[in-house]
Amino acid sequence: MWTRKSVLSLVCGALAATILPADQVTPSAWAAKHLVVPDGPQAGQLWNPDQTPQLIEIMDHLSPESPVNEVVLRKSAQLGATTLGIAWSGYVATVDPAPMMIVMPTLDSADGFNREKLNPAFEASPSVARRVMAAASRSARASTVRTKRFPGGSIILTGANSTADLRSKTRRYLSLDEIDDWPLDLDGQGDPQKLAYARKESYDATGDWKVLRASTPTIKGESRIDEAFEAGDQRYWEMPCPHCGGEQRFEWGTKDSAHGLKFRREFPHQAHYVCRHNGCVIHHHEKPAMIRAGRWVASCPGPGRYPSYHLDALSSLFAQWDSIVADFLESKDDPTRLKVF
């Protein structure tokens, strides 16, 4: 028999379910359950955090429950880090609706990102597809090629070469991608990165804005992402040696260093790693377990420093050390090719 108290309890429970805070699920947990990866080794499958464990902490700082406003990722190419921006976008569309902007180097690259990665991921992920308005609709609220609309917010895709978008849109969340490829000056109106930051000024008073900057570095001394990384707390993926347990990050060895990645210049390169603590020889087949046992450690913590992360090919589960060495030897005399490392 229904009583007034039981009915009231049921109604209150249903109401509470609609207004629970977003901390009920983190971005990484959401992605593992809902995000279908559009390309790469995991294409067509749910995102597997076990394949890129380094992204978990970075993703979760993009949750509204994290007090962090800024996150920086300095990365090598082809590490699966594109998933970071896609996952955050899907999370915003389904869990934490708000106005968001994704800024690529150019409008053309923004269109390519949407066509090849973001749109396929959204269409393949049912929870996102249900929330994002269809582009085919004639409604004024329909999505377009460069705008994803959903209840409570929208995601605008644009380029760092677009004066109109960088000067006119108010956004709570900004994902600034490949910032080293952005122009230094936009049509005489200044640094596009500063113009992008101005889009979130309306949220400065509430402090609930977030900015993700991610890029492969270009030329040393001229790199935006290097500067951003060094202004942060400079986190590296530290892993325990499988033989002595000493924590360390993977580094390239040199002729003067006893530790690091060692290899023959001739094929086969026989790449292996020498532990910095006890000189233990670590073989490639031991690398996956090391990476999965790793954690982010800040090398330069301090007041006012935001989380900044360094992720390179040596600690990627997708890359073979011998292949990395072969590519490095081909690229070592070309600074523009070396940036992928």
Feature roles, as predicted:
Residues 2-341:
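Phosphate/NTP-binding elements of NTP-utilizing enzymes
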